[in-house]
Amino acid sequence: LGLGSFMATSAKAETTQEASFAAASALTDALQLALTLEYLEDEYYRLGINTSGLIPAADKVVFQQISKHETAHVVFLKAAISSLGETPIAKPNFDFTAGGNFQPFTDYQQFMTLAQAFEDTGVRAYKGQAGNVASNKAVLQAALQIHSVEARHASKVRRMRMNKGWVESNNGGNMPAATNAVYAGEENVTQAGYNTSTLFGAAAGSASFDEILTGQQASMIAGLFIS
């Protein structure tokens, strides 16, 4: 009985330790992904506001403020990763033309198109990683705070482009096909087993609930702009 009890206790301790390591790894991976996305947005807006003649004066103040937010997010995430005893990933080399498909720093409309795509990606990506940062309450709180700010960015940029401030179905609005991956899955109308389109219709049902992006999906989208 004593040996059996010891073995059971040891197995439980080992399982608990393995779960703890898994949670720590998931937390770090989530933060590194978030840092990659924030690096992307931070550099994008910095380049945009420093490109002479690109952004109209009336809009520039908006992007200057968004840029400040993204820089603050980068600083926080690097500090959070370091506090966990890990090394923050280095900032990648970005190609915001995505291999020549976009010219955001010579065409303001394209600049805003990618701004919307990046912000909508960020909103879904943070939501997708919530479970992976739940093991650390301080990080979870900060991640949720960043998530809500990213949602405000997305809504503002969408309205600047004459779109609704929210996403309906998998239609990003007046967006090119090259951004389809950002909105894939947003057409879902079933939440916790309930079909929200039953009472409200598919457009309202899908718009009422944002969908997540998995880490793999978010990394794939970001990877399109990493050289």
Give the role of each language-model region.
Residues G2-S227:
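All-alpha RGS (Regulator of G-protein Signaling) helical domain and cognate RGS-like helical scaffolds
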